[in-house]
């Protein structure tokens, strides 16, 4: 199993090119199943989750291949509508094939998902919506077995999600695109990745209004065609590398990104004392002193994203003063706290609240990554610590950060990937 060996006390500075967003690429890949003609997707990151979903789609007999950052897909040869546990167990986004399969082919058998262990994140909202569209849903032996109503077409309906759900919104708008009639969805997620998916569906011939709002109206069409589309830049990767500048009196320029995707995070960075400058496709963060304490409350978009909570907490560990974090999205999303404390942080957790008392510096220690975003907070913390830190279970970081060692080295981090079996 791979580990990172990081020799700390680095100043994080330099330029880094941001990849396509994993959280956008995965639903876009699933949406390719809806198209009757070939689809080409650009700016697709080379990540384990992406490779897993491509393998899953290919296992259905679909011709799908990746060259560089481009994926092409032709669904003409599909011969089954099955998503096996062996693949789905590693990645929650696999459930996103359910809507496209059900809408286009009238049936699907998809294993219940896996992925990061940061709360239950149930798929019940997906299933309730499909049932409202006339589907028959049963769960047997860990698999969701879905069947469209008589005639093979889902039926448009009016449905409001009980809670804001990104995956649920994505799954249902894909299904509604080919449903018979009009679907009105309420309490939709507003995340940029949802907007990106809706825009691609429109490019494929879907009729969707209200994109980027809490209520979307989807008028079902008979068929969707392929298109050529590019994945939106990864706002979380952007924020993660900019965070390194705030921790180390650094200066980081992120390219191929958009400040419009990261407004709530950039505002908090400025509150912490960073100098933020932006252009059409770049963001620069400069830090000249010690970070200031800040209060963070995670919220659905356009609020502060839960996927940046761990990275900003790592900054707050070095801040002058006491910061308070309230996690409103997922339970169990403070699993990085004991590991940051091992590196010398002073954090106490009570339920959904974490209180962070700033310390002068981190100290090197062996730590263990617990989930995708937590792993990046540990990498950045270790990069600032005096001495050598060993980070275990880094397969988590490989799920969400493309070419992470190369990008970190370009920013001055002394990092080496080693195999613990060596």
Swiss-Prot record:
Binding residues annotated for UDP-N-acetyl-alpha-D-glucosamine, in chain numbering: 92, 121-125, 307, 329
Gene Ontology MF annotations: UDP-N-acetylglucosamine 1-carboxyvinyltransferase activity
Broad EC category: transferase
Cellular component annotations (GO), alphabetically ordered: cytoplasm
Modified residue annotations for 2-(S-cysteinyl)pyruvic acid O-phosphothioketal: 116
EC number per UniProt: 2.5.1.7
Location in or out of the cell: Cytoplasm
CDD domains: UdpNAET
Record-annotated membrane-spanning stretches: none
Example GO biological process: cell wall organization
Coiled coil in keyword set: no
UniProt: phosphoenolpyruvate binding residues: 22-23
Residues at the active site: 116
Catalytic activity reported: phosphoenolpyruvate + UDP-N-acetyl-alpha-D-glucosamine = UDP-N-acetyl-3-O-(1-carboxyvinyl)-alpha-D-glucosamine + phosphate
Family: Belongs to the EPSP synthase family. MurA subfamily.
Record function comment: Cell wall formation. Adds enolpyruvyl to UDP-N-acetylglucosamine.
Protein known as: UDP-N-acetylglucosamine 1-carboxyvinyltransferase
Native species: Psychrobacter cryohalolentis (strain ATCC BAA-1226 / DSM 17306 / VKM B-2378 / K5)
Classification of source organism: Bacteria, Pseudomonadati, Pseudomonadota, Gammaproteobacteria, Moraxellales
């Amino acid at each position: 199993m791979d580990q990172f060996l990081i020799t700390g006390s680095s100043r994080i500075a330099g330029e880094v090119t941001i990849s396509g967003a994993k959280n956008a690429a995965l639903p876009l890949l699933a949406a390719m199943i809806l198209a009757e003609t070939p689809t080409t997707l650009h700016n697709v990151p080379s990540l384990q989750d992406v490779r897993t979903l491509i393998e899953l789609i290919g296992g259905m007999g679909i011709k799908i291949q990746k060259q560089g950052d481009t994926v092409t897909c032709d669904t003409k040869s599909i011969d089954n509508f099955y998503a096996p546990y062996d693949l789905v167990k590693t990645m929650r986004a696999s459930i996103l094939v359910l809507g496209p399969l059900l809408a286009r082919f009238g049936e699907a058998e998809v294993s219940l998902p896996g992925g990061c262990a940061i709360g239950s994140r149930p798929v019940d909202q997906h299933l309730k919506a499909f049932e409202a569209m006339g589907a028959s849903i049963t769960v047997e032996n860990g698999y969701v077995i879905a069947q469209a109503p008589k005639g093979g077409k889902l039926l448009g309906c009016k449905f409001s999600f009980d809670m804001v759900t990104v995956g649920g919104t994505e799954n249902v708008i894909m299904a509604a695109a080919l449903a018979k009639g009009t679907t009105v969805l309420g309490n939709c997620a507003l995340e940029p990745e949802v907007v990106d998916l809706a825009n691609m569906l429109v490019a494929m011939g879907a009729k969707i209004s209200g994109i980027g709002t809490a209520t979307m109206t989807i008028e079902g069409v008979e068929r969707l065609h392929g298109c050529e589309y590019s994945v939106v830049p990864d706002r979380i990767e952007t924020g993660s590398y900019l965070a390194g500048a705030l921790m180390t009196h650094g200066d980081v320029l992120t390219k191929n990104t958009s400040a419009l995707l990261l407004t709530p995070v950039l505002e908090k960075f400025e509150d912490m004392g960073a100098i933020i400058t932006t252009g059409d496709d770049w963001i620069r963060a400069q830090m000249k002193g010690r970070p200031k304490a800040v209060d963070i409350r995670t919220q659905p978009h356009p609020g502060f994203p839960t996927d940046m909570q761990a990275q900003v907490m790592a900054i707050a560990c070095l801040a002058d003063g006491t910061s308070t974090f309230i996690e409103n999205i997922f339970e169990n999303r403070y699993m990085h706290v004991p590991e940051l404390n091992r590196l010398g942080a002073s954090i106490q957790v009570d339920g959904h609240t974490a209180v962070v008392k700033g310390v002068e510096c981190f100290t090197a220690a062996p730590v263990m990554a617990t989930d995708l975003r937590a792993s990046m907070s540990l990498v950045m913390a270790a990069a600032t610590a005096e001495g050598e830190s060993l980070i275990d279970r880094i397969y988590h970081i490989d799920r969400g950060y493309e070419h992470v060692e190369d990008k970190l080295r370009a920013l001055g981090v002394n990092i080496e990937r080693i195999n613990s079996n060596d």
